[in-house]
């Protein structure tokens, strides 16, 4: 089997908050008549530049044409050579490698007539406990709207949430107090996510303030600036709660292991460059005796299905994970969206080959956008994933 062509389709899909996220749907064609699909998820992140899709397609074709899709390690090395790792969270090269690698996995599994999770080594479970995100309070008046989100999602079966914190601690504290008062033990807040906004000392003070409202807290996420390994270590010594950090390069993961800076690796294929790299990162965590949580950039169903296959194949996921992306959008580009039930993400049925997801060409056309340009998006809209222009 040889790769014969590549398609890249940019789509822009609004979240329920009004913020439009742009993604790229990947199709890889072969001489066997099989097509693999993937997703370069959520290009709507800083830094404030966009990728030219025509140039990207030509560059990727120069790597992929004529290749055997099963040569995953060879292709991934060539992808990394051309789209290198950096020490930055939202490196767009990782998004690109992720979309291609996921499509290759879909293609290979389809050829073998098995599911992607079987191609990854089989399943240890069929579902993953996940949480719904509560986005960061900038103003106290946002507390009530976020409480409405909890009410709505609890009715839909989501009983675990993660809270983005650090911009307005008074509002964060008010929200937690009211959640505890209204919902009691019916709701858990699994993590406080600082998103690298504060230095570790300020994060430590915030943690002491917010953990008065421990509602099943499992971890503290990203409580220091990016790549501040010493800060993470210092904070880890001073809090009783496990510290979690995203993995965005193997060098960065190596440094966190060397410094013993964290307890839990937050691993997401989009940030580390695909299923192949995510699996490596999970194995490195296991060797280092660290737990893993499955992260997210709020993918659509194609990207989330890939994550579900990965999560159900790993043995060291012992905490509530994050992939609830499809629930945040007003639409999708597939005929069969991923399944959520009672707060769990279910992997597609293993009797369905590949990722188990089928594109809907009419929806792909409906949400198609000409490019990945930014329009008039502000920094705070990017950070807080809102269409609200108030700052």
Curated annotation (Swiss-Prot):
One Pfam family of this chain: MR_MLE_N
Keywords: Lyase, Magnesium, Metal-binding
Hydrolase recorded as keyword: no
Residues reported in the UniProt entry to bind Mg(2+) 1: 42, 45, 297
Catalytic activity, EC: 4.2.1.158
Residues involved in Mg(2+) 2 binding: 193, 221, 246
Superkingdom, natural source: Bacteria
Family membership noted in the UniProt record: Belongs to the mandelate racemase/muconate lactonizing enzyme family.
Note: The enzyme product is the enantiomer of the product obtained in the galactarate dehydratase reaction catalyzed by STM3697; the enzymes thus differ in their regiochemistry of dehydration.
Name this protein carries in UniProt: Galactarate dehydratase (D-threo-forming)
């Amino acid at each position: 089997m040889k790769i014969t062509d590549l398609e890249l389709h940019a789509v822009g899909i609004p979240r329920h908050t009004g913020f439009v996220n742009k993604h790229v749907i990947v199709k890889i064609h072969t001489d066997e008549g099989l097509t693999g699909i993937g997703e370069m998820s959520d290009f709507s992140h800083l830094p404030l530049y966009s990728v030219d899709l025509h140039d990207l397609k030509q560059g990727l074709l120069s790597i992929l044409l004529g290749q055997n899709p099963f040569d995953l390690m060879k292709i991934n090395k060539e992808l990394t050579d051309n789209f290198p790792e950096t020490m930055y969270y939202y490196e767009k090269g990782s998004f690109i490698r992720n979309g291609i690698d996921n499509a290759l996995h879909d293609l290979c599994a389809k050829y073998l007539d098995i599911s992607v999770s079987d191609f990854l080594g089989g399943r240890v479970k069929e579902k993953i406990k996940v949480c719904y995100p509560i986005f960061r309070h900038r103003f106290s008046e946002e507390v009530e709207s976020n409480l409405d989100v909890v009410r709505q999602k609890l009715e839909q079966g989501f009983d675990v949430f993660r809270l983005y914190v650090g911009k307005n601690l008074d509002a964060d504290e008010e929200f937690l107090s009211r959640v505890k008062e209204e919902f009691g033990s019916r709701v858990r807040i699994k993590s406080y996510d600082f998103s690298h906004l504060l230095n570790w000392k300020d994060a430590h003070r915030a943690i002491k303030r917010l953990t008065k409202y421990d509602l099943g807290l499992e971890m503290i996420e990203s409580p220091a600036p990016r790549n501040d390994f010493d800060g993470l270590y210092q904070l880890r010594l001073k809090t009783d709660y496990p510290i979690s950090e995203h993995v965005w390069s193997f060098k960065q993961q190596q440094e966190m292991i060397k410094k013993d800076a964290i307890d839990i690796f937050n691993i997401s294929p989009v940030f580390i460059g695909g299923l192949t790299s995510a699996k490596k990162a999970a194995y490195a965590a296991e060797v280092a005796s660290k737990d893993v949580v499955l992260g997210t950039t709020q993918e659509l169903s194609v990207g989330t299905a890939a994550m579900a296959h990965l999560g159900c194949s790993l043995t060291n996921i012992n905490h509530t994970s994050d992939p609830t992306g499809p629930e945040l959008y007003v639409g999708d580009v597939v005929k069969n969206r991923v399944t959520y039930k009672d707060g769990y993400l279910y992997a597609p049925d293993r009797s369905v080959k590949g990722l188990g997801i089928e594109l809907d060409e009419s929806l792909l056309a409906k949400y198609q956008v000409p490019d990945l340009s930014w329009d008039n998006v502000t920094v705070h809209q990017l950070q807080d994933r809102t269409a609200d222009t108030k700052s």
